[in-house]
Amino acid sequence: DTSGQIDAQALLSVTPPPQMPATMEAGTIYGYCVGEPWNQQAVFKGIGVPVITDYEIWKNNPEKVFGVSKAWAEENPNTHIRVVKAMIRAAMWLDANNNANRPEAVKILAKSSYVGADADVIANSMTGTFEYEKGDKREVPDFNVFFRHNATYPYYSDAIWYLTQMRR
């Protein structure tokens, strides 16, 4: 049943994002929903293609969430503020000068102590292009927006919306 109905036969499982391409390649899973660079990894390996990107669903969306408990925030107010400020500064840096810092960010993220994926794979979604399948590489200048358009501003209303959607 591929109609998306409630009795559709699909097995949902939890797999850490970096392991998703290898798990699919091994035949343990048949598809996955994940942020980049793991979709691009499937394209590069020739084992899968993205069906749709989050950019096509909701442009300039907050793609990741940094959430802490109220207790932790109250116990660590200075640390909490500093971490949020650091993330906002990093987002500003990534979008500065028409994304001029992205190639440097790709080199940093490709290190094994960070994301550890190949720089070419990370660059595909960080530097204004996206490869939907082998040979179908498209210009998508705002595929990843980190600060422009207030994309990652910590709006309370966004947090509430996400929580209500997860509860459904």
Regions found by a protein language model. Give the residues of each.
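Ligand-binding "clamshell"
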Residues: 41-55
